[in-house]
A protein has these predicted regions:
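A solvent-exposed interaction/effector surface
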Residues: 1-165
Length: 165
């Protein structure tokens, strides 16, 4: 039996990112997400900059004007230095700070990553914690056997719990 915990959950954690380059990924671009990631790296190099740390994936669900659920996905990387004069489709934020998050450290095969999100949602449900409905996934380390990822889910500042989408 494996005694290593696959998903460790902690409450009241803070996600802090500095010099963040952000690229929103549209629904029809999802199949090209690896290409988009490569293009981000190329863009950073053409600006004479370099990344610090791993890729971060932001996701949330929003309703559109027709009442349809739209999934929002953004790729983010931290940079060594700020970039000025950002070109579309990129945006830059000097700092992103998300306080009071539910946190999960996932250490398992990449195809099982969805269980980290599920475990955090179940933990929130069992402890009457209201989640905002978005998540930040920091891809800490990856090899052939396993992925280590940190998942941050922002708590809702009041209001009702997010219903299943």
């Amino acid at each position: 039996m494996n005694t290593t915990e696959k998903i460790i959950v902690k409450e009241n954690k803070t996600l802090k990112l500095n010099n963040v380059l952000i690229r929103e990924v549209s629904q029809n671009e999802l199949v090209d997400i690896n290409k988009i990631s490569y293009m981000m790296d190329s863009y950073i190099k053409t600006k004479g900059n370099a990344t610090v740390g791993p890729m971060i994936n932001y996701s949330s669900a929003e309703g559109d004007e027709n009442g349809q659920v739209k999934i929002v996905i953004k790729l983010m990387v931290q940079l060594k230095n700020p970039i000025h004069n950002i070109d579309k489709p990129y945006e830059f934020k000097s700092q992103i700070r998300i306080t009071n998050c539910l946190f999960g450290r996932f250490s398992e095969k990449e195809e099982n990553l969805q269980f980290a999100y599920s475990k955090l949602q179940v933990h929130a449900f069992e402890n009457d914690i209201k989640l905002k409905g978005d998540s930040y996934t920091v891809f800490v380390n990856k090899n052939e056997e396993k992925l280590v990822a940190d998942v941050f889910m922002e708590l809702d500042k009041g209001g009702t719990a997010i219903e299943g989408l």
